C-alpha cells in the first residue's frame, strides 16, 4: 500500500468533525465554530455524493451516540445513505469513550458482508473510539510494554520508562488499535471482501501530547532512572518548531494490488479527495486540495487553521512570523509571500 509519512490533519475547534468534513469536501474547516454544528444545513459537494453518482452505496459506522458532533444530521448531509451509530451495536465491551475498537470491528464485519452481498459497489467510513485520550485504563486492553531493559553490573534490570506516563499510555493504545485493524482486515479477507477493495486509514487529529511528554521520552536515562538535566550534553531540547511539526497523523491507502511505497510529500486532509478521486475516477470542482500524486516538484503547501503553513522547504509560523527552514536551500521572499497569499485564499477566496 501507499504510506504518506508527511501527512497532517487540518483541524480547528471541531477536531474529529473537522476532519470528517475536510476529508469529505476538500474544504478547510470553519474559523467560526464548527461546520457540523454551525453550518450543517449548507450544501456541500462530497466524496460520498460523487461516489453515489456512480451507484455506490455509502454508509458510516461509529460506536458513539449519533448526536455527538451532530453526526446523525451531518452525515446525512454529507451524502451517507445510512449512519450506524451506537444504537446499531451491542455495547459488550467498553474502553475509554465507549465501545471498544475490537468489538466495534468484530460487529462491523457481518454488517459490511451484508452490504457487500446486497450492493455491487459500496463506500464505508468506520470511526473508532478507543485510541483517544485519556487512555485511563489502557493496561486493561493493551499488554504492550513501554518499559526499558538494560544491563547494569552484569544484571538485567527493567526500568519503567514510559509506563504510567501520558505518552506511554498513548503508545500502548496505538498498539491495541493496530492489532484491531489487522484483525479487521483479516476477517474482511476471510469473507472475500478485499479482492476488489481499497482501504484508507487516517488519523483525524494528533494526540495532543504536551512538550513535556516528548522531553521526558527523549531525555529519560534508564541507568539513573531520571530525566537528564537541560545542561547535559546529551539533553534533547524539544523546540517550538519541532513540537509544532510533530503532529503528523497516519494516512495509508491499501489494496491487494498496490505495491508498497512511502510518499513523503507534505500532504494535508484537503488533499485526500483529489488524490482518492484520481484513483476512483471522480473530482470536485470545489476542491481546494491537490492530487498529491501529481504535485509539481513535490512542493505542496499545507495550510493550518491558525494561518501557519508548511511546505517541503519551510514552516511558517503565523503567530510570530517566524520561518523555520526544512530544506537546505536559500528561500526568497517571493516564495514566502506567494504562499502567505495562498493561505489567505484558502480561507477567504475561491481557488485560483
For each feature predicted by the language model, list its residue ranges.
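Solvent-exposed soluble domains appended to multi-pass membrane proteins
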Residues: 1-352
Amino acid at each position: 500500500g501507499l504510506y504518506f509519512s508527511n501527512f497532517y490533519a487540518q483541524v480547528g475547534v471541531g477536531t474529529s468533525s473537522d476532519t470528517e468534513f475536510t476529508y469529505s469536501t476538500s474544504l478547510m474547516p470553519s474559523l467560526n465554530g464548527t461546520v457540523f454544528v454551525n453550518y450543517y444545513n449548507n450544501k456541500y459537494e462530497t466524496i460520498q455524493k460523487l461516489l453515489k453518482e456512480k451507484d455506490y452505496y455509502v454508509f458510516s459506522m461509529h460506536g458513539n451516540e449519533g448526536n455527538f458532533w451532530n453526526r446523525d444530521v451531518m452525515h446525512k448531509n454529507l451524502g451517507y445513505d445510512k449512519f450506524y451509530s451506537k444504537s446499531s451495536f451491542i455495547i459488550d465491551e467498553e474502553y475509554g469513550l465507549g465501545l471498544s475498537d475490537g468489538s466495534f470491528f468484530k460487529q462491523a464485519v457481518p454488517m459490511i458482508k451484508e452490504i457487500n452481498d446486497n450492493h455491487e459497489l459500496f463506500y464505508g467510513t468506520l470511526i473508532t473510539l478507543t485510541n483517544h485520550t485519556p487512555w485511563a485504563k489502557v493496561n486493561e486492553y493493551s499488554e504492550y510494554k513501554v518499559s526499558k531493559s538494560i544491563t547494569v553490573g552484569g544484571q538485567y534490570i527493567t526500568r519503567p520508562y514510559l509506563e504510567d506516563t501520558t505518552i506511554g499510555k498513548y503508545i500502548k493504545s496505538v498498539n491495541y488499535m493496530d492489532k484491531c485493524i489487522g484483525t479487521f482486515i483479516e476477517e474482511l479477507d476471510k469473507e472475500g471482501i478485499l479482492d476488489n477493495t481499497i482501504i484508507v486509514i487516517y488519523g483525524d487529529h494528533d494526540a495532543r501530547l504536551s512538550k513535556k511528554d516528548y522531553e521526558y521520552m527523549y531525555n529519560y536515562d534508564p541507568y539513573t532512572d531520571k530525566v537528564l538535566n537541560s545542561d547535559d550534553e546529551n539533553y534533547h531540547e524539544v523546540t517550538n518548531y519541532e513540537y509544532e511539526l510533530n503532529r503528523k497523523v497516519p494516512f495509508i491507502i491499501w489494496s491487494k494490488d498496490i505495491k508498497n511505497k512511502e510518499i513523503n510529500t507534505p500532504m494535508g486532509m484537503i488533499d485526500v479527495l483529489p488524490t482518492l478521486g484520481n484513483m476512483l475516477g471522480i473530482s470536485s470542482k470545489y476542491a481546494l486540495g491537490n492530487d498529491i500524486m501529481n504535485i509539481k516538484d513535490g512542493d505542496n503547501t499545507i495550510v493550518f487553521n491558525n494561518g501557519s503553513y508548511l511546505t517541503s522547504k519551510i514552516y511558517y509560523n503565523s503567530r510570530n512570523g517566524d520561518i523555520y527552514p526544512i530544506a537546505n536551500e536559500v528561500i526568497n521572499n517571493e516564495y514566502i509571500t506567494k504562499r502567505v497569499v495562498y493561505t489567505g485564499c484558502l480561507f477567504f477566496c475561491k481557488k485560483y
